[in-house]
Amino acid sequence: MTVEQNLEALDQFPVGMRVLAVDDDQTCLKILESLLRHCQYHVTTTNQAQKALELLRENKNKFDLVISDVDMPDMDGFKLLELVGLEMDLPVIMLSAHSDPKYVMKGVTHGACDYLLKPVRIEELKNIWQHVVRSRFDKNRGSNNNGDKRDGSGNEGVGNSDQNNGKGNRKRKDQYNEDEDEDRDDNDDSCAQKKQRVVWTVELHKKFVAAVNQLGYEKAMPKKILDLMNVEKLTRENVASHLQKFRLYLKRISGVANQQAIMANSELHFMQMNGLDGFHHRPIPVGSGQYHGGAPAMRSFPPNGILGRLNTPSGIGVRSLSSPPAGMFLQNQTDIGKFHHVSSLPLNHSDGGNILQGLPMPLEFDQLQTNNNKSRNMNSNKSIAGTSMAFPSFSTQQNSLISAPNNNVVVLEGHPQATPPGFPGHQINKRLEHWSNAVSSSTHPPPPAHNSNSINHQFDVSPLPHSRPDPLEWNNVSSSYSIPFCDSANTLSSPALDTTNPRAFCRNTDFDSNTNVQPGVFYGPSTDAMALLSSSNPKEGFVVGQQKLQSGGFMVADAGSLDDIVNSTMKQEQSQGDLSGGDLGYGGFSSLRTCI
């Protein structure tokens, strides 16, 4: 066959494909031959498997495809399949009347490219040429790089010449793909050979701990532990990792135990510690900023070293800060109308730190604590028998002011218009008689003797009509408003006063014609215990609170400090006694109408 014939046959492929048909049944062999010829294939037939094998061995390049029956007397079709596949490397199609999957599987595993059932159809035979093309492609992949060519003629030579141009590149690519497949297989094998992960169960951990205890914590090594445990499939690396985790666990446990021991030892030092008192056996230094039981609850300071202005909350007892307790007692017997000069007192820091150190503290109440209980006992029978008085009283002893039972800052508070106290009937007659005789005997009689504890010189105030913690009010008032005594405007406008005769002046006084008492003046009886009126509302903590008058106005805002009031009051003249300006409204008593 010339080259031109080879090229022509290549262009007409699969026409002229060479097929070898083998079957012991003559009828089936004739039908198969006719069908193959109808498909324009070149057919060679034989009824013996051994003869077919000889034909193939004589010229292996003479045929392109082999069709063989499975059941043959001289040789099994599967045996022929193996020999052809090993010697000639040709595609073989198995033909059988058995459709059992076992036969099909056996044929495929032995190298058959297809499995056809009898009777064979022409449609199946028309597509058998694809097996030839596939086998040639496989041959090209398996050929060497030197370009060896197989000897042959016909269509096979034409097919080889068609693929000579890209043979080198295909070989390199196929070799690269084969190398990748081999590497992938090696990786799969290595993954399959990986050791399984060790799970430390309770029993395994117990063996580990027993081995560590037997060797000792310091001498426990992974190799020795592994030998003592004697567990299958347990490596030294597994034991070393678990030993490291075990040591970290023991270190953490020991740290927690040491911390608990330190805390247990230090509990004794904190047993005597209070949240606000600190350590009981150690005094708190001055300026520590910590409150404790011995110090006052709060010390306030006035600006510029004075007691503060009357109508400003910047002095002592700022609103909502602190207020004096109800029923505070005086320490000595002093007349009600007599004022003493208030000077700056030395600070006492013996009982604790002051939260406002370095600032002027004109009032200090710590010095009044010593005689507090004594003054209570002495004045228990002479205390006021009521809730409180309408106006506050003032008293001093040396450098101290007023003793508060709970060491709160004492403030001078302005009170709303309150109801005047009622006097008991069994004592008011004695006092009216005493005061009437005293006034009628002289125009300016001497004041009652000091340190007098007689019952005639004592006020007893009955409880108010409404016993409740609300601010006291004047219930019975006339059209004219009432102002507390010692008004700043009154004291500044009054002439000098003889301080030897202490009297109390009121702007609003009214006496009946039958009392024989000089209007505008009365003698303040000496007393041992007087109570200051405390505001029921703790937020009413002014120096002298802004007292709203019934007429709709307020007190003078620039009346001056308390020091100015005290000094001006001491200079008032005794002759200025007529301070008419309103009726206090003592409706219950016709013989005496005055303010206290």
From Swiss-Prot:
Residues 138-153 have a biased composition (Basic and acidic residues). Coiled coil: none annotated. Keywords: Activator, Cytokinin signaling pathway, DNA-binding, Nucleus, Phosphoprotein, Transcription, Transcription regulation, Two-component regulatory system. The keyword Transcription regulation applies. Signal peptide: none annotated. Transmembrane segments: none annotated. Its main location: nucleus. Transcriptional activator that binds specifically to the DNA sequence 5'-[AG]GATT-3'. Functions as a response regulator involved in His-to-Asp phosphorelay signal transduction system. Phosphorylation of the Asp residue in the receiver domain activates the ability of the protein to promote the transcription of target genes. Could directly activate some type-A response regulators in response to cytokinins. Involved in the root-meristem size determination through the regulation of cell differentiation. PANTHER family: TWO-COMPONENT RESPONSE REGULATOR, TWO-COMPONENT RESPONSE REGULATOR ARR12. This is Two-component response regulator ARR12. It comes from Arabidopsis thaliana (Mouse-ear cress). The gene is ARR12.
